[in-house]
Amino acid sequence: YGEVMRECLAAAFPHYDPERRILMENAGFADTPEGRLFCPGSSLEVAWFLLHLLQRFPDDARRRQVLEIIEGSLEFGWDGEFGGLYYFMDVNGRPTLQLESSMKLWWPHTEAIYAVLLAHSISGDEKWMAWLERLDTYAYKHFADPEYGEWFGYCDRQGNLTHSLKGNNYKGSFHVPRFLLLSIQLLERHRPSA
């Protein structure tokens, strides 16, 4: 499996956009809608996967680059007017093929929260805690259901729920439990000793 993990590590970097410090959804499509597509949630999810791989195959330069990808994805993908991470974006500001692009979905926020926790545990840089506060505040205000548990999945750009359902063909019980489990495990490993 080691060789497959190395291949996965190498396969991610052709998607890297150094100007924006993000991972593009598709590589090699030049100036097409598919080639300009950025999904903050996917970029952040792949970035934390890469940090896990880099724990197995250490490379300080790549690790720094992945931390830049997390920061770039958060900065580029964050809606400065209404908060939250966009679902999809065209990196040149053109319309996307995805009609739901301006929506805010639950799963990019779960990926972002775990990514910043992991980035902080690796770097110790407090900027990740500022991002954690911003992400946590947004996610728990807009997605978490304090009365019945679980998370709602879909908000419009302004942060208003568009659907009250908590499960469908796309929203299952995967992203929320995974980010909670990984976050708890990470925090327990880094808990100060008594």
What are these model-predicted stretches?
Residues 1-194:
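Glycan-recognition and catalytic cores of secretory/periplasmic carbohydrate-active enzymes
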